[in-house]
Amino acid sequence: MLEKFANIFRIPDLRKRVLFTLGLLAVYRFGAFIPTPGINSEALMQYFNANSQSALGLADLFTGGNLRKLTIFALGIMPYITASIIFQLLTVIYEPLAKLQKEGELGRRKITQWTRYVTILLAIVQSFAIGLTLTGSSANMVTIPRGAFIPMCIITLTAGTAFIMWLGEQITERGIGNGMSLLIFTGIVVGLPRGIMDLYGKARDSAWGAFTPIAIAILIVAMVAVVAFIVFVERSERRIPVQYAKRIVGRKMMGGQSTHLPLKVNSGGVMPVIFASSMLSAPLLFAGMSFFGSPKLQDTAFFGPILRAIQPGEPWYEILQITAIIFFAYFYISIVFRPDDIADNMRKYGGFIPGIRPGRRTSDFINDVLTRITLVGALYLCIITVIPTFLISGIHFNHLWLVGPVFDRLPTWMTNGLGVNFYFGGTSLLIVVGVAMDTVQQIESQLIMRHYDGFSPKSGRIRGRRSW
């Protein structure tokens, strides 16, 4: 295994890409130590510790702990993710954007440019909401006048978001892996030591009473089982057999071989979970916003019940999360995987699925198979996301309308969870394992392409023409 890792640095181009990626990730982490001016760090930390199981804890997970310290990268990559979701939805329902996307590289560049503009706009709105929330709080989290802090907060956080967006795009283009996913991955991994220390502190202080050993054992077993389950499903695929007919090209006989079309069970990877979590956590950032003396949104008669109902651990939040994950699983696969194009390419090169007519029938068959396995993949994402969250923060079944009193006798750990933070949740584990596997797979592809052995036992080196 050490020999295979050493191969990475023997290939100049791959070595350059890996070092470039690590360098930009280091720059991203350096920004976590630059606070926004005018912040009372101790008061802000106490506020976040008291609300670690709320939507703030989930939002802080995606920012790598930058939100709880309100650094220049406090918004993280969330505005960019939200903007990307908006434009991907628009390309489906708005015909001019759909045509622009089909124009090739020029059209995609135009959409990317608009996505950046919307990202900046969302960053301005979210930073304004954060400024209003902090200055309107009674916890004395701001040390300078409100009129000076809010513009400074908007400028600082928006500039930080623009820089993070640039970092992610540079990693994707010139580094290894998906830049945006790697930034989220880095933030979660860096926060794991703090999560472990919190877990140790709760166990030492007997915060869970007589059930401390059982609670820790359940958490460890659940995490190991979740990781193993993620690895198993992420490597699972449905293989559709494809046969290529023989044909004569010049003086050579081409085709005649049998192959397969691999369809991953979870073709969308971690993106449906990231999209769903981002969409659910973004509105909750406005919960504490107060417009110059008016009540906070979370205290108003209209928005208050809605915002409280979609907090993590609430039944409606889990229902919305499951619905959003299933929706984005199908939506994402409809964008990245087009059965019509695959069927046309197969027919063009003389390929066909045994028992299925080429053309429209092949496209329908691939679409049917993809629909079924995407449902399995979406349900897998829901299980991975919801069950660990149930163990960690619980689900408040007793808050359900009408049937709530039926659940009053449930054990406390089922309704309140074990009380640890989101770094041990299914969302974080799925992102960490999924992004790590995707990145390793890209490095492995680069190694095999250059005739080196990959990391997995089945990935032997590819022989060049000289060895035939």
Predicted regions and their residues:
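N-terminal cationic and glycine-rich segments that engage phosphates or anionic surfaces
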Residues: M1-Q101, E105-W468
